Amino acid sequence: MNRFTLYLFGFLLLAQANVLACNFKIANFGSPKENIKLDNNLPEPLLMPDRFGGENLIIPMEDLCKIDKSLYGTAVIYLYIENKLTRIQLYRPNMEDSKLMDYAMSKYGFFNLPEGMPKTSWRGSYIWESGNDMIEYIRTDIHEGYAEIIDITSKLYSAGMADYNAKVGEWLDSQQ
């Protein structure tokens, strides 16, 4: 009986942890932006079309994760190409921490940093595969600071993402 009680307690503890965890993946890849449903008390998410054929739906993490505050200050950007969710990006600029790196390592797997280098000084990227998803963690310098980024894309929509990235690259090359 004690073993059963212990298992039941462990299961309830794990179930509670999943309820409290933040779920920013509120839509499936390939679904239209109209499928995004938020709490009625929240303001409408910001929808920004871009010159490359995409639309970015931007939602602050605070609107998605009421209980888990560890990623507050992060923007969640849903990229729609031809009204299909193609990429989910977590963008965290100029924070004095490495919370997206910690999140990525705990969720997708650990990767080694150069010995003796603090996490906040490291710049680079790391890629994981999880089922049909490609996950890339990026820490890079930006104008007046740095940013942490997690890009999640589906292999099923990689051709559309490659075309989109090619358009962005051409435009960036023309700006030099």
Segments predicted by a language model, with ranges:
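Cleavable N-terminal signal peptides
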Residues: 7-9, 19
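Mid-chain, structured segments of secreted extracytoplasmic proteins
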Residues: 61-103
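Bacterial N-terminal signal peptides that target proteins for export
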Residues: 1-7
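Non-cytosolic coordination micro-motifs
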Residues: 20-58, 87-176
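Residue-level detector of intrinsically disordered/flexible regions characterized by low predicted structural confidence
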Residues: 4, 57, 68-69
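N-terminal signal peptide c-region/cleavage motif recognized by signal peptidases
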Residues: 14-17
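Sterically constrained small-residue positions within well-ordered secondary structures
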Residues: 12, 69, 79-81, 117-119, ...
